[in-house]
Amino acid sequence: MNSQKHLENTMLIVMGDHAQTLNGDHGGGTSEEVETCLFAWMPRSLPSSISSIFHPSTCGLGLNGKNICTSTMQQLDFAVSISALLGIPFPFGSIGRVNPELYALSPGSWDRQWLPASFYEDPSSDLKMWKNNYAHVLCINSWQVKRYIDSYSATSVMGFPSDDLHYITKLYNEAQSRWSDSKNRSCKPENGTIDEFSDFLLSFATLARSAWTEFDMKLMGVGLGIFIISIIFHLFVFERVQSLSNVYDNKTQKSSNHLQIYVAFLLVAVRAVSFLSNSYILAEGRVANFLLATTAIGSIRSSLVYGKIKKHDLVFLILIILIRFGIEKGMSKQAATNPFLNYDSGSDFDLKWLPSLFEGHDFVTLLPEISPMIILFLLSFLSCKYITSTVHSRCIKWVVTVGTMLSYLFIATFWLSERSFAPKMVYVIGLSLFVLNFVLRYLGILEKGETVQRLRSLALVMVSAWSPTILILLGKQGPFVVLVCIIAGWSIISSKNKGLLDDCKMGPISVMQWSLLAICLFYQTGHWCTFDGLRYGAAFIGFDEFKVVRQAILLFVDTFGISHILPIFSLPFLVTIPNSSSSKGRDKTVIFLNLTQVYLLYGLITAITTTFTVLCVAIQRRHLMVWGLFAPKYVFDAIGLLLTDVLICVSALYYC
């Protein structure tokens, strides 16, 4: 390039994204991993006056005998520095400062060829020209940052402290005043102008860094301590309820139940400790599916000890395999555009897995349209059958059955015609049934019958109120996912009642399986623990206009419906569907103690895993992917824990 005259004003800039340690690690928070290298070169030699901008300690002779300067700059300054060199507007969200050394490499910042001849007589005119240009660039740079500060302060919930904002504003006003004075002195800016603009930019960068990237270790320690104390208290209450249950149930054989508790907490510990690995967070659905399959294989092995494999264990294992394939689809980056996960009435099944023998035939064309309808019809039949056989009150039975059937009819209507009124009717019916459940519950209308029968009816009515809304938000994958959820739940309950531990009214392993199944369904339905993993299209099913509260509620139900709402409200089935021989004559106190154990254990499992998520985020707070990976995972788990606690409290008010 030195020999090419027309390239003398060319600048070459090469920058890496980040570096790595000597052993190849490149994702952590050490200086070796987060720092990078920037190489800037131009064929044109700098005037001696401009070379004085570079500190003497940073420059020296290279291997080729030419002068090479090595300095440092904040990565925050890169975007605005390149924008200044290219002569394009500064990015609005950038709060960096144009780097003086990088800016000095550009001949356009000090070249005198367009200035009067008198400038050529002064050797220092290059430096004066550069100072004038650099001060002008910093003025625009500061104006852009100040505009961002004002916009952020006006829209942010937290914002910056008022004292800090007042100080930053004062620095900006002083710099602007000096710049205005310098413009009135025949283009002779003083060093003070550059210094004051630099002070303003550096001061705000420090303030922003302290507010956005520096963490309060004391508050983090307090929060983590609260988590640990709550878990200890949770364990104490669980053990207390376990002891009371044994006393009321006249149990003398406790070893088998304790063995289940140890195995369940071993699985919880394996999953929780795995959160300390960023690789696990990226494959959480697969690992949860693996742990769930481990419990199924263990149940089959236990059956083999008695010489017979139970059909529900085989069905459960087959379902887990099917769920694994669904997780692979849901966790793929193409999930957002996967037709299986769409919301409209078009094709919702990926036909690539079908043999080429069937491609082009009517069967392949009709399958995506027919199969969701067939499964939806099957779900409506099962709902009608179990509601009529479980709920004894004729009035409640009629209302719930008609409401559920109408909801399924509106879902089918929406898929066939895309009429927006159909989803709205589903939402109204679901909300009405939910409110009606609580009203009838506290009026005493649902208090008839034995305790087990009453709890079973309450749980079935509650699940029937929520299922259609969650189903329509999931799209045409909804019927298949809900059917898988029902069959898997039946397998878990059957395994609890017919396994080795027939005397246990509350199976810890069954609760653990219930929790793992909920996690698997979350990922199978195409959700991610990232903000771009939210299925925003679900929030507009039935609506064309955007309303913040309405769309937020629908998006929230779509995200947490299949993984939190349905699993938690259906937990009473683990207690109320025992063997027929053991269900008769069960004391009411024992039943509610067992139900309390189930909810305590489910909440404890969620609390332990969330605690390790918090610990992982605290450890990885300086990681390169902290905002892209760990922070979203923390947000999802924290909201999931809060929702779990709220739903458990609602369940306690509703079922007890």
Describe the function of each predicted region.
Residues 1-31, 38-39, 82:
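Metal-dependent active-site segment of extracytoplasmic phospho-/sulfohydrolases and closely related
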Residues 24-27, 50-51, 94:
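Short, solvent-exposed loop/turn and secondary-structure capping segments
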Residues 213-656:
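Alpha-helical transmembrane segments of integral membrane proteins
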